[in-house]
Amino acid sequence: MDSDFEPKTLSDIPPERRPSIGEALLPILGVVVFLGVGSGYLGLAPHAPLLWSIVFAGLVGLVRLELTYADLYDAVSNGLIMGLQALLILFTIYALIATWVSAGTIPGLMYYGLGILTPEIFLPITALLAAVVAFSIGSSWTTAGTLGVAFIGIGSGLGIPAPMTAGAILSGAYAGDKQSPLSDTTNLAAAVTNTDLYDHIDAMKVGTALALGLSVLVYAVLGLRAGGAIPAGQVESIRGALAGTYATTPFVFLPLVVTFGLALYGVPALPTLVTGVFAGAFTTILLQGAQFTTAWNVFLNGTSPETGVELVNGLLVTGGLSGSAWTVTVVALALSLGGLLEGIGVLAVLADELLDLVWSENSLVAGTGIAAFVTNAFSAQQYMSIVLPGVSLRNAYDEHDLDSRNLSRAVEAVGTPTGALIPWHAGAVYMSGVFGVPTLTGSIDLANLSASIGGYAPYYAFAFFSPLALFVMAATGYGFVAKSDA
């Protein structure tokens, strides 16, 4: 996304087309009702409820705000353009995962990982390793789509539930991404708030360290509880199946080395991932003995290996490029909805209403975090959650003599990690797709007055601790930097 993008503020909207707070809440209520009834009650995939939400928001724009079809079209187009890189990365990651499975890269990581790790240390090690990789390459998505997929397999072999493993991967990946000078969101947060990049990173370090440390502690406790759950001989059975199906020499890690090497060198995400696809295809041919056409059919159609062990077969089934359709269409619909809500002025009105509730520096910083989360939920992409409050609240920080690094820290502490908690958000749809684990599931038993919650969200500790650290710092004033002292 272009960091020069500036979303509408209230002053940008002509008075005759400016939504009232009631009109702004109408589309928001529609989203909540349609997703709640459609996905929560009827059990539909999110596609139809998102489409209903888009149509309803469009009707509000046409009927109540007297916008034209061209206005609505432009708003939806802007939402899709903002998320275009995310959509292209989605296509590419699905192809990359398939070629890396066929190349033996992901099976190789599983093979060696199962020989080293134990259930007791697996989850904290996963979180820390994901943090190091994401910090090094500047991408939570790439970390999850490569290292993360392999660790889901390792965790399954060790008897660790996949939602726990997914939560640990995400905690580390987003913590590392958040602090990396190579990360797109880190650079974006600094750019839209007019903050020096390294001042922004420095302002986040205490909150990130605290949130990641608490997350690792949670995973250490979960790991102790998971210990001893492996059926006798399961690890060796899995390793034997992997070694019997794939060549597991260290050379199978060539695609991984090439991809991470390019990322460390600063090559943009898309060409890096495309190169990883080519490296995976050629490793499949050279090391696994596949025909040229077979390797490139995997790129399109995915893998369905027969290893002789059902658990391993299930872990290594991939959809390839064609398997990305479900995920990409959800993300495209969510981006369209987010662009429409921004374009008709709904998000600008909500941001302005937030400012009316600010009475101190402490409430401003806490309110910024809340604004980032609300924007994440209704725009369905983390870029908007950083850009909208980052641009809209700059003057408020000046008026309260707060340096811009306070603003950049607040929008990223909440905006970057929390998207993957929201089931229809682009980040959550992506992570759920690559891990094969739902973001959030739930059921209510009215007869017994009980409820259950599943998916990876309850185990994604960093997404809870990062905002919590920000709110504690906001309440105490810790880490505030006055503009006059900067």
Q: Model-found features: residue ranges?
A:
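Hydrophobic alpha-helical transmembrane segments of multi-pass integral membrane proteins
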Residues: L90-I93, P119-A150, A334, L347-L350, ...
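Intrinsically disordered, low-complexity non-transmembrane regions of multi-pass membrane transporters
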Residues: M1-L26, A70, G228-A243, A295-E310, ...
